[in-house]
Amino acid sequence: MEETKVTRDTKEEILITALHRFARDGYEAVSVSQIAGDLGITKGALYRHYKNKRDIFDHIVARMEQG
C-alpha cells in the first residue's frame, strides 16, 4: 500500500512530538500514551505508524544520523 501524505505528516508529527517529550522529560519518563495525548490521537492510531516507543526513538536517531 502506498503511503499517503496524511500518513507521512502524521508520522512526522509523532517524531517531532516524541523528540520534544524525550528532550524535556527523558526517554524513560515518557509513555506512548503521553505522546499520543499530546497529538490528540489514540494509542492505537500511533501504533499504526510505529511498533512501540523504542521504534519511535530509533527513527528519531536515524534521522539525526542522516543529518
Predicted segments, located by residue:
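Key DNA-contact positions within bacterial/archaeal DNA-binding proteins
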Residues: 44
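Alpha-helical DNA-contacting segments of helix-turn-helix folds
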Residues: 58-64
